[in-house]
Amino acid sequence: MSGPAVSVLIVVWNAERSLRRAVDSVLAERDIDLECVVVDDGSTDETPRILAEIAAADPRVIAVPMAANAGVSAARNRGLEVVRGEWLTLLDADDRFRPGGLSELHRAAVTREAGAVVGQQVWSNGRRTWISGLYDRSDIRRPGRKSLVAAPGLVYYASPHGKLFRRSSIAGLTFEGRVLGDQPWVIAALLRAGDGIEVIGDVVYEWIRTAPAGAGPSITTATRASTQHGIDAAGVATGALTRVIAEASTAIADPDGRRIVAAAYVDRLLRSDLGAHLGRALDRGDPTMGELFTAIADFIDAAPAGLLADASRLDADGDSLARDIVAPPLMRWHRVPEPARAAYRRLAAAAVAAQPDLIRHGRNRLDRWALRVALWESGGLRFRIALAALRVSRATSLLSRGFGGLRRRIRPRTRS
């Protein structure tokens, strides 16, 4: 017997509050022949009971229990063994498909003969809905037929959410690890789609993060968790990059095309997966940030020669290594604990060794001078002046960009 048109794979763990909402958003799609495979990764709350009730009420729901909690990647891999659809999409138990979103993905896949379909997603916290700045890129937002080589900005959208993959093209792909485990899988799936990636403008996926009042961790606990997550991400980033490079070598004949994809992924890792956690550690003055500096330095040291320089030429906003990794600790040097400063010096040295023209990526002449002095002098008056100049330069740049955005918003629209 042939399988359904679409398989939706959901992994759940202690999701008693959100499971029904997630599954209901799938089952509401009555225009598609689908199955909803829900893998319970060893839940200890009411999730197993709720899942059993849902599966008993609708034959489209297939419950797959794991013997014990094994992590999201292992649970997803178990789900991949069960799904039968021609097309596959993934949904987190905390999130939901927007009404009609799954139908729009499937319609684009069928009518446009795509290898993969990429829809839009929004973020919601119960009070407002927004689009993350990281995803607000023309390669992601502008509809049309694309490939990762021609539209490397798609690499920034390396989560499995809001996408539809032809299942035959992902044969043999597996998720690995608890951190960054989905990114190489998604990038490999998109690489296998070649120039058959169809981007649609419809918002199909809602990424929901709300917490009950008083249920959140303390600021200190949350900060330490974020820093540790960054350390873990840096520790596995080299392996993730290696997987992407290997898949690109198989999928792309042109060496330049392979480097474009690899460089885009490096830029994404630095800007989002590592830079974001570094920024949070600085915001709160986390005393363990030295470990994060060391982990990022190890990743930079292990990166293939020239790849960081390639990445710096891809981002229109400037070099992510300078902007998101090297400069932020200098701009908030007073928040860097004394024991972490030696680790930062090693990080800065690794960055300069990997990208000798790093200081050229300052936003202006003052910025470049300040960065040069701060990187090569460990203290003294010139160092303190450079730090002050760096802060002034970056603040001026942010103000300029803010006013520019305001002017674009209030500028009268001309009629064609």
Predicted regions and their residues:
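Nucleotide-sugar donor-binding/catalytic module of glycosyltransferases
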Residues: 1-254
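P-loop NTPase catalytic cores that bind/hydrolyze ATP
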Residues: 258-288
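C-terminal, non-catalytic tails of nucleotide-sugar-dependent glycosyltransferases
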Residues: 232-263, 302-320, 324
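Generic alpha-helical structural element
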Residues: 40, 112, 226, 230, ...
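Membrane-interface aromatic/basic loop that binds lipid-linked glycans or pyrophosphate carriers
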Residues: 282-416
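Generic structural hydrophobic/aromatic packing signal, biased to beta-strands
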Residues: 117, 165, 207, 241, ...
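Hydrophobic alpha-helical membrane segments, chiefly transmembrane helices and signal peptide h-regions
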Residues: 89-90, 272, 296
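A broadly tuned preference for mixed-charge, low-complexity surface segments
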Residues: 168-169, 255-265, 326-336
